[in-house]
Amino acid sequence: MAVYAVTGGAGFLGRYIVKLLISADDVQEIRVIDIVEDPQPITSKVKVINYIQCDINDFDKVREALDGVNLIIHTAALVDVFGKYTDNEIMKVNYYGTQTILAACVDLGIKYLIYTSSMEAIGPNKHGNPFIGHEHTLYDISPGHVYAKSKRMAEQLVMKANNSVIMNGAKLYTCCLRPTGIYGEGDKLTKVFYEQCKQHGNIMYRTVDDDAVHSRVYVGNVAWMHVLAAKYIQYPGSAIKGNAYFCYDYSPSCSYDMFNLLLMKPLGIEQGSRIPRWMLKMYACKNDMKRILFRKPSILNNYTLKISNTTFEVRTNNAELDFNYSPIFDVDVAFERTRKWLEESE
């Protein structure tokens, strides 16, 4: 029976991974490692769940928290393209924090690491080039924001660490998973958009081109892909060792506006008029100045305006081929759970 650790386990995705691990037959103990205290810690009658408050940049504390662990699912990250954190803060957690986790793997002889990367490790790029493809599609990877850069660098670090020698001459095996736009209960950004619509009289004003298609994926299916990858990476000859996979399900691929309307229309939200692009650019520039001068974050800035209007559509079944992944939550269930959460959080 194994001991798993989930860094960022008190977060949006991490909590769902912990919930699913409770049903994993081969897991005896789950260590939930996060810099913040979980206000609603998950409990179980069949698994030992230990919560450890820890900064992943503190090697000594990380080493202590991971001593005796067999496998790490590393989700801890600062996900920010709005200006809440400085560039240095984002790099410190996302890149250097991953370095710390890898160093602990080597020092403690932990043989398996599943890393939560991001679609932004690939794109959309700073040029606004559309992406339609799979893990092996050629694309100009040129990050336009420090968050994307940090996830790209951390993913490369984890991929390079695969098959490296650790304590007692054993080998470290790694795998990276790249979620596209995650939604589901607990998604703060979806909640912000819903609240804005309510403030505007149940109207969603459109800010994104209809042909800017983005792949989306439900948080429960992303979590399930992590749990499956953690199982399969331990098999001799597993194809996932040293590989990266996009996270996907059968959620509709469409523009951000259209997706939000599909999700929220049963909650009384109606489509509004389109805000002119020149006006959006003007507000984005103003918000960028506020971020620079006053450290005031904003959902609308020049970076988010560009990437939301740039197609990023994933078409792949590689996770199914290599580790037998298929979604365990269909779209109707995913939407219903998300809607229920939005209603209850009003």
Curated annotation (Swiss-Prot):
Secretion signal span: none
GO molecular function, one term: oxidoreductase activity, acting on the CH-OH group of donors, NAD or NADP as acceptor
Superkingdom, taxonomy of origin: Viruses
Stored Pfam families: 3Beta_HSD
Entries under Gene3D superfamilies matching the protein: NAD(P)-binding Rossmann-like Domain
Disulfide cross-links: none
Pathway: Lipid metabolism; steroid biosynthesis
Record GO biological process: steroid biosynthetic process
Induction: Expressed in the early phase of the viral replicative cycle.
Reaction(s) catalysed by this chain's protein: a 3beta-hydroxy-Delta(5)-steroid + NAD(+) = a 3-oxo-Delta(5)-steroid + NADH + H(+); a 3-oxo-Delta(5)-steroid = a 3-oxo-Delta(4)-steroid
Keywords tagged on the record: Early protein, Host-virus interaction, Isomerase, Multifunctional enzyme, NAD, Oxidoreductase, Steroidogenesis, Viral immunoevasion
Binding site for NAD(+): 151
Keyword Transit peptide: no
Active site: 147
EC numbers for this chain: 1.1.1.145, 5.3.3.1
PANTHER family the record matches: BIFUNCTIONAL POLYMYXIN RESISTANCE PROTEIN ARNA, SHORT CHAIN DEHYDROGENASE_REDUCTASE FAMILY 42E, MEMBER 2
Family: Belongs to the 3-beta-HSD family.
Job description of the protein: Catalyzes the oxidative conversion of Delta(5)-ene-3-beta-hydroxy steroid, and the oxidative conversion of ketosteroids. The 3-beta-HSD enzymatic system plays a crucial role in the biosynthesis of all classes of hormonal steroids. During viral infection, steroid production contributes to virulence by inhibiting the host inflammatory response.
Protein name stated in the entry: 3 beta-hydroxysteroid dehydrogenase/Delta 5-->4-isomerase
Organism: Monkeypox virus
Gene name in the database record: OPG174
